[in-house]
Structures are given as structure tokens and as C-alpha cells.
């Protein structure tokens, strides 16, 4: 074999090695650590030692870019603003706000003669900047806060969650302290993070870009001028990262001995 032929062969082998090895190094060094990144699930003790509406208003003052209709809110059963037998607390899905389901939630609350609290997950509906410094624990705080508010406005708490909100609601119900403050659990298409090709590709893609833009209203055939404030159309990569970390970390939590009734609804569109 001539020197020129050997050189071509070595060069070809080197190219093949690079093509095969570089992706493996990238996957092992970037993608897998991201997907397997977890935290210890600990829910904070939320103490509301003041008027509950004042407490919520003060918390939301920190987020000036939030549309008033997307903020955390209590919808009282009547003008007396007193505790009802049941309270409904709602955790919405990822990249949305509680505005999307508010009309339905109000109808349910009226039917049950219940006060209603619609929460707002961290980084949702509050502008791009609020998505940059998120931590997974923020979503656990949201769930704990929702339960605390529910106990301030109702004698019995119905904790309801949709998609990612359903994941955090389920995790809250598995916590020993919080489970004692929850009387019913309603899960609508709860997000169950699992290692699959779509998540693998998404995790890899987040490495290359930090800022993302989507048009969620258009995806659902909704007018932008009306619905833009209630979707996370622009976000930093930390938002999906920390959502994943929070939900993935809680996937193996086990139910303690409990008698909490659970209502579960699954949507085929959420099979991922």
C-alpha cells in the first residue's frame, strides 16, 4: 500500500472517528447530565399571617410585566369573602397561565359553592426576564403556596392541576405535611416526564440557543391580540430546563398512607 493510499485511509478513519465520537462526547457531557439532573424534593412551609388577598397582591407586585388578568387571584363565592366548605386551588400547565381555564373553573366553583384560587407558576405570564433566573424549587413553592391559600379560603381543599401543574399537584399530595391539608386531588392530563426521543432532542437543542420564541395562540387558533398576555411566547432556556428538573425529580415519589380521593383524566394529546 502506497504512502498516499495509507494517508487517505487514515484520513477517512479519522473523519469517521470524529463523526462517531464527537456526538457521543456531546451526549455524555451535555445532554445526559441535563436529563438526569435532579433535586431533593422539599416543599417549603408557607405561612400566611395576613389578609390572604393582601398576601397575594404583595407577591405579584414583584412582576410588573404580568397582565392583571393573568395574575394569581382569588375568586370568592360571594361578596362576604368568607371561608366556604370547599375551596378549589388550580395549578395551570406549562407555557400557559390560569386564564385559559378560568371560565370553566369559575363554573365548577359556582356549582360547588366554593371559593377559587387560580395560581400562576413561576416564570409564566410575567415576561421574558422572569424566565431567566428560574429554579426548579420555585414550582414547588407555587404548589405549597396554593395549598396554603386554599386552606385560608376553604375548610376543605380541592387541589386541581393540569399538565405540568398536575405533576406538581401530585407531588404535593405525596408530601407528608401538605397531604394533610389536601382533601381532594384532581389531575387533568398530568405531565409525566420520561426519557424519550422528543425530550432527548429538546435537551440537546437547548444547548445551542438561550432565547426562544413561539406563537402559542396561533397553535390553538386563538387571536394574538387577545391571548398573547396569557402564554409564554418568549422564554429563556431555563424555563423548560427547570420545569423538567422539578417534575423529573418527583417521578419516583411514593404516596404515603393516605385517603385523599383522586380524580384523573388523561388526554391522548399528552402522550409523550
Where are these regions (language model features)?
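N-terminal membrane-anchoring alpha-helices
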Residues: 4-52
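The alpha/beta-hydrolase serine catalytic core
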Residues: 43-72, 190-256
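Short, surface-exposed "cap/lid" segments of acyl-processing enzymes
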Residues: 76-111
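Conserved alpha/beta-hydrolase
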Residues: 112-126
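Catalytic nucleophile-loop/oxyanion-hole region of alpha/beta-hydrolase
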Residues: 126-153
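Gly/Ala-rich beta-loop-alpha elbow adjacent to hydrolase catalytic centers
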Residues: 161-165, 169
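A conserved short beta-strand
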Residues: 180-190
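Conserved small/polar residues in nucleotide/adenosyl-binding loops
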Residues: 265-272
